[in-house]
């Protein structure tokens, strides 16, 4: 399993995107298992942090292909054998008060490579003790703090962010674009 976790900022609610690539090392299609609270069997399990809202997917809808039980979301499509046979793109917002946010994100499967990209804004401080910092990198004109972890078993990743945009704050990146400065 590979996972990419991408976070951007809106005043009062960071937006998160997660991209997962799954495979099935068996020789038969996995059709799922019974999950309490669902009528259909669940095949793949994803977790969203406490308080996540506006949950969407690229290839399916919550309440249809994807079913939510608590903070766990299950895919209901069978998983065929092979490497990287399923990709899931999940998006959500995480509302918060003030300018800091603590997130606990569960990864229920072994992960070969996790990449966390957090859009960098002036004054943003990130503490991710389980991850290795890759510094700040420019990707398509946007600066991101890069964090990584390789080869880990199922676990919870804790992330603490301070210096986020408060609910009624102006986004400094928008001000820089308006001023003609594309360096942020």
Report residues per predicted region:
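Lumenal/extracellular ectodomains and adaptor appendage modules
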Residues: 1-184
């Amino acid at each position: 399993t590979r996972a990419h976790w991408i976070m951007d900022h809106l005043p009062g609610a960071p937006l998160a995107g997660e991209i997962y690539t799954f495979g099935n090392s068996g020789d038969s299609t996995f059709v799922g298992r019974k999950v309490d609270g669902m009528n259909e069997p669940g095949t793949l399990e994803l977790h969203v942090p406490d308080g996540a809202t506006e949950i969407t997917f690229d290839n399916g809808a919550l309440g249809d292909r994807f079913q939510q039980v608590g903070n766990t979301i299950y895919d209901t499509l069978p998983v065929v054998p092979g490497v990287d046979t399923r990709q899931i793109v999940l998006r959500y917002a995480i509302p918060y008060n003030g300018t800091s946010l603590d997130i606990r994100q569960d990864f229920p499967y072994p992960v070969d490579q996790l990449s966390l990209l957090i859009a960098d804004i002036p004054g943003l401080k990130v503490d991710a003790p389980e991850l290795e910092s890759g510094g700040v990198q420019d990707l398509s004109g946007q600066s991101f703090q890069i964090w990584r972890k390789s080869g880990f078993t199922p676990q919870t990743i804790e992330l603490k962010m301070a210096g986020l945009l408060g609910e009624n704050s102006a986004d400094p990146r928008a001000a820089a674009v308006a001023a003609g400065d594309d360096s942020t």
